[in-house]
Amino acid sequence: MNKTALKTRFAPSPSGLLHLGNIRTALFNALLARRSRGLFLLRIEDTDQERSSEEYVTALMEDLRWLALEWQEGPEVEGEAGPYRQSQRRSVYQADFQRLEAEKLAYPCFCSQEELERVRKRQLAAGQAPRYPGTCARLSPEEVEGKLAAGFKSALRFRVPSLTTIEFEDLVRGPQRFATGDIGDFIIRRTDGSPAFFFSNALDDALMGVTHVLRGEDHLTNTPRQILLLRALGLPIPRYGHIAMIVGRDGAPLSKRHGSRSVRELREAGYLPEALCNYLARLGHHYEDSGFLDLDTLAAQFDLARLGRAPARFDPQQLHHWQREALARCDLDTLERWLAPVAASQVPADKYQDFIETVRPNVVLPEDALHWAKVLFSEELVLKDGILPIIHEAGAQFFTQALAAVDGSGTDFKALAAQLKQTTGAKGRSLFLPLRAAFTGELDGPELARLLPLMGVARVRQRLQNCVDQSY
């Protein structure tokens, strides 16, 4: 591939399951690469070995593949810029640590966390933004050697140039400007020898040829630090774009109390990947086409200029909308396989296909199909709130007449309703609502004309008899 071709990346830390914010970032980067016929790269940022887990590496790759977000470089695919796991790149980082230190662009820092916390509190009390005061930057070479010889552990800090302004054009937020005086020297290598995020993240982007980085707005203030590092190392600087965070309806950062779940949880609940992609692609990005789009079309219409700066509000109902749209495009075989794990054991085999076709308009998730299977085929019917008063209002005589009508109509609902209308004089809501209440225990649902043949005459009669008994 042409070295100047656009390349994006997704660089998760495998310390947990992917959530909606993670996967939307991955989706936007994948769409941008696909639209431009570029490359989408996956890098595993597992330098924190205590928090990283192989289980989560496997899980995040499964989630990406489930969503059809295939990477062209990365684990299990590889490429010219590998390895693509940061835990396997220690020698790469070490070489540049040594180079920066040799060129006096970085220095050992022996400050303890307690010392740094005391300084931070003093700065905050004085109304100053916390920043490193440069304590160890003033140590002489002899003092550094003495501390190292005495067994003091050191981190490595990047020496931020003074009186400098960092400017860049954010792909989403436009011109950005940061004064280095507000930054302070920052750690690039921890005391245990592992690279800090600022360092390994920026270095790998450059070495792996990443040209465009779309990431959360919480990384905006990291960008000037990373630009300084890449300049110091003489490496190319990607173009950065910082996308708006996802919030709940109350404007607070998205959490489980807003209905947010991990991608794995959504997958296990039965959401379809096409539904999730259609929803997330529009969460902070405006598409002129409001219809259901496949991944190629989502990519073709993806436009950086249409990425919003305001927080994107998560709405579970919108996710349900796209789930319905995705389901409407599924053929019957796909639906049968999708619902089989929860519904097949609850439905007689000879009625399974008719059941799927009947409840399809009322199903968003497999749990909905399970609910209707229990409604239709369980011996005991659970009545929803508000159903019993409807049964009482219709009265025993109504359901007695309905039982008589079944003798002539069987499970033909239209014939049953016509005869019952004639014998009781009930019509409209007064006719149909008590029957729905009797047969399903619900106020709404699939067409009764399709439900009764599934239930069979014996169950239809039993439920009408139950209503007769409950009406006295």
From Swiss-Prot:
One Pfam family here: Anticodon_2
InterPro entries, per the entry: aa-tRNA-synth_I_cd-bd, aa-tRNA-synth_I_codon-bd_sub2, aa-tRNA-synth_I_CS, aa_tRNA-synth_I_cd-bd_sf, Glu-tRNA-ligase_bac/mito, Glu/Gln-tRNA-synth, Glu/Gln-tRNA-synth_Ib_cat-dom, GluQ/Sye
Keyword terms, alphabetized: Aminoacyl-tRNA synthetase, ATP-binding, Cytoplasm, Ligase, Nucleotide-binding, Protein biosynthesis
Sequence motif 'KMSKS' region, residues: 253-257
UniProt superkingdom: Bacteria
Catalytic activity: tRNA(Glu) + L-glutamate + ATP = L-glutamyl-tRNA(Glu) + AMP + diphosphate
Recorded GO MF terms: ATP binding; glutamate-tRNA ligase activity; tRNA binding; zinc ion binding
Gene Ontology process terms (BP): glutamyl-tRNA aminoacylation
HAMAP family from the UniProt entry: Glu_tRNA_synth_type1 (MF_00022)
Name of the protein this chain belongs to: Glutamate--tRNA ligase 2
Species, as recorded: Nitrosococcus oceani (strain ATCC 19707 / BCRC 17464 / JCM 30415 / NCIMB 11848 / C-107)
